[in-house]
């Protein structure tokens, strides 16, 4: 025998279920991503010391794991390339670092030992205030091959429609 439920019961049950999902971890769903730290690009051996992917778009609450696939690398935020109120990170050499992104905006990161060789990357966290730190992040000065790598990365982000 099946019991018919009223619209009121259905709505109350649905609201309670949705609330429990939201309260359980702060988000209905989150995604985990991996960024590999590599000595060379498997698709183009001319590209050395890279993060793969080097440009990533995520949602608030998503997690990114920086995986030291090759030795001698780390991942850390670049000063001035972090949204206000966001948490900094600085991974140790040869160690995985996991970062949950709770603040919309642009996050520029690097491998400290290889930054001047152009080992940099950008994570764009979508949300209402995501453009708030764009100009500050773009204005950060870089040296060595990182300068050219950032120019190319910003061009790629622009072409992908990530910068407004």
Q: What does each model-found stretch correspond to?
A:
Residues 2-6, 11-164:
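Extracytoplasmic copper-binding redox domains, predominantly the cupredoxin/blue-copper superfamily
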């Amino acid at each position: 025998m099946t019991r018919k439920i009223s619209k009121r019961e259905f709505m109350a049950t649905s609201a309670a279920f949705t609330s429990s999902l939201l309260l359980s971890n702060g988000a209905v769903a989150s995604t985990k991503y991996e960024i590999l730290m590599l000595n060379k690009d498997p698709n183009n051996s001319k590209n050395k010391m890279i993060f793969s992917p080097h440009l990533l778009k995520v949602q608030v609450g998503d997690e990114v794991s920086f995986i030291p696939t090759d030795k001698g690398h780390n991942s850390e935020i670049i000063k001035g390339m972090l949204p206000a109120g966001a948490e900094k990170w600085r991974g140790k050499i040869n160690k995985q670092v996991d970062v949950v992104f709770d603040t919309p905006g642009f996050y520029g990161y690097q491998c400290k030992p290889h930054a001047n060789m152009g080992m940099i990357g950008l994570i764009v966290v979508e949300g209402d205030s995501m453009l708030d730190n764009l100009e500050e992040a773009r204005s950060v000065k870089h040296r060595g091959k990182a300068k050219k790598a950032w120019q190319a990365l910003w061009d790629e982000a622009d072409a992908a429609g990530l910068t407004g």
